[in-house]
Amino acid sequence: MKTKTAFMAILFSLITVLSACGAGSQTTGAGQKKVQTITVGTGTQFPNICFIDEKGDLTGYDVELIKELDKRLPHYKFTFKTMEFSNLLVSLGQHKVDIVAHQMEKSKEREKKFLFNKVAYNHFPLKITVLQNNDTIRGIEDLKGKRVITSATSNGALVLKKWNEDNGRPFEIAYEGQGANETANQLKSGRADATISTPFAVDFQNKTSTIKEKTVGNVLSNAKVYFMFNKNEQTLSDDIDKALQEIIDDGTLKRLSLKWLGDDYSKEQY
C-alpha cells in the first residue's frame, strides 16, 4: 500500500512538471514575453507603398517593411487590416488597429492625439503633379483659379491647405476618396487641374496606367515619415525603433526603397 502511495505521488509530481512545461510553450522562451498580435492599419490605394498587386496580394514599401519588422521582433506577430485612408486614424483612436503604416507625417494636431516612433523610415518629397501634356502649370504658383485634388487628411492635403491659406487662397482644394485612379481620371476629364504627389508614386502611375502624369516645380515638403500608435504603446514604439535602426544600418531599408520606390528615399536627398 505504501509502495502504491509513493508511486501515485511520483506520478502526480511528474504530471505537474509536464503541465508546467506545456504552459511555458506559450511564451517565446524562459523569461521572455509572450507573442503579442499587432494589427497594422494600412491602405490599398497608394502606389508603391500599400496596394494590391496583380496576384491580389497586399504589398508595397510600407507593407514589406512591416513584414521585415515581423521577422526581427519574434515576440510580436504583425497582421494587416486594410481600409480607406480617411478611416485609418479613426480606427487607431478606437483601438481597432495598433499601428498605422501609410507614410504618416507628423503634425501638431496628430501629435496631440497619437504617438509617433522616433526613427523615420522614409523621406517624402511632395510636388505639384499634372498631366504630361500640361505645359501651363509649372509649379504651385501657377495654380491661381485652378482646382487641385488630393486625399482628405493626407500629408499632401496639409501642405496644400497651409500654402493656400498663407497665400490668399488662390486655388480650390477638392478631396477624393478612391485613391490614385480617381485622381488620374479627374485630371484626364478636366474636373481637376492638378494634384500633389511624389516622384515614386507618379512613376508607378505612369507604368500601370494609360493616364500619364509628371511632377513640376519645387519640392513643397520633404517631411520624414513614421509609424503612428496610440499614446499607451510606448514599448511597442521603442521596440520597433530598435529593429528599424538595425534595418537602416544593415542596408535593408535602402534595398526596399530602391525596389519599391526606384531610389533611396531612406535618407533625405531633395
Swiss-Prot record:
Lipid attachment points (S-diacylglycerol cysteine): C21
Membrane topology reported for the UniProt record: Lipid-anchor
GO CC annotations on file: plasma membrane
Location relative to the cell: Cell membrane
Keywords from the named record: Amino-acid transport, Cell membrane, Lipoprotein, Membrane, Palmitate, Signal, Transport
GO biological process: amino acid transport
Induction text: More strongly expressed in the presence of methionine than in the presence of sulfate.
Alphabetized SMART domains for the sequence: PBPb (SM00062)
Lipidated residue numbers (N-palmitoyl cysteine): C21
Transmembrane segments: none
Signal peptide range in chain numbering: 1-20
Family statement drawn from the similarity comment of this UniProt entry: Belongs to the bacterial solute-binding protein 3 family.
Function according to Swiss-Prot or TrEMBL: Part of the ABC transporter complex TcyJKLMN involved in L-cystine import. Is also involved in cystathionine, djenkolate, and S-methylcysteine transport.
Assembly with partners or alone: The complex is composed of two ATP-binding proteins (TcyN), two transmembrane proteins (TcyL and TcyM) and two solute-binding proteins (TcyJ and TcyK).
Protein name in UniProt: L-cystine-binding protein TcyK
Species per Swiss-Prot/TrEMBL record: Bacillus subtilis (strain 168)
